[in-house]
């Protein structure tokens, strides 16, 4: 398990719906569908192009209109942190809500557990032992091999400052 299981999807969807209500979002349908499917085209987990085609076919099969499908796919494709690159992509309120909900599930106790689960899934160590004289500063940690602890510095410790909605903040 990578930490992207059905329990994660359920938490993200529940959080997104709560945020949507508090933010008075009008398109709850987009928030709910994008939340439920938010990891289906994540390049960490699948081949993105093939997954996007399957996702689009599925969304048409449940009789969504083209504009709604395009919005859902845009949100899902630009949701992931991706080394901070997706933070430059402007999302609709619906997209901001789903992104915030996903990020909220990556911090706190659940986020800590998921970070170690993710590292284990990808055969990354908890931490790579270093001589005391070589322990990096937070700015230098990205030069070290991937590990669960490095993931905190690469991403998790930055998320609280990247929330879009007032409710998530």
Locate each region found by the language model:
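An active-site-proximal "capping" alpha-helix that borders the catalytic cofactor pocket
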Residues: 12, 49-62
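Conserved strand-to-helix beginnings and helix N-cap segments that scaffold or border functional pockets
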Residues: 45-49, 109-110
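His-Asp-centered metal-binding catalytic motifs of divalent-metal-dependent phosphohydrolases/nucleases
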Residues: 28-46, 73-82
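Hydrophobic, well-structured mid-protein blocks that either form specific transmembrane helices
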Residues: 59-99
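Divalent metal-dependent phosphate-bond-processing catalytic cores, especially two-metal-ion Mg2+/Mn2+ enzymes
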Residues: 1-10, 14-24, 37, 87-169
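Membrane-helix interface segments
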Residues: 26-28, 68
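Short amphipathic alpha-helical interaction patches enriched in hydrophobic/aromatic residues
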Residues: 20, 39-44, 59, 63, ...
């Amino acid at each position: 398990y990578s930490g992207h299981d059905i329990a994660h999807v359920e938490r993200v969807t529940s959080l997104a719906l709560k945020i949507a209500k508090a933010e008075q979002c009008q398109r709850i349908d987009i928030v709910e569908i994008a939340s439920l499917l938010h990891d289906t085209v994540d390049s960490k987990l699948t081949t993105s192009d093939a997954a996007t085609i399957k996702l689009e076919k599925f969304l048409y099969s449940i009789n969504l209109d083209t504009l709604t499908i395009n919005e859902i796919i845009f949100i899902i494709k630009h949701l992931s942190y991706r080394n901070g690159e997706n933070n430059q992509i402007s999302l609709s309120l619906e997209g901001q809500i789903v992104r915030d909900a996903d990020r909220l599930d990556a911090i706190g106790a659940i986020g800590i557990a998921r970070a170690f689960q993710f590292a284990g899934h990808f055969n990354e160590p908890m931490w790579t032992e270093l001589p005391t004289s070589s322990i990096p500063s937070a700015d230098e940690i990205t030069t070290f091999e991937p590990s669960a602890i490095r993931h905190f510095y690469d991403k998790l410790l930055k998320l609280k400052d990247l929330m879009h909605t007032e409710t998530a903040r």
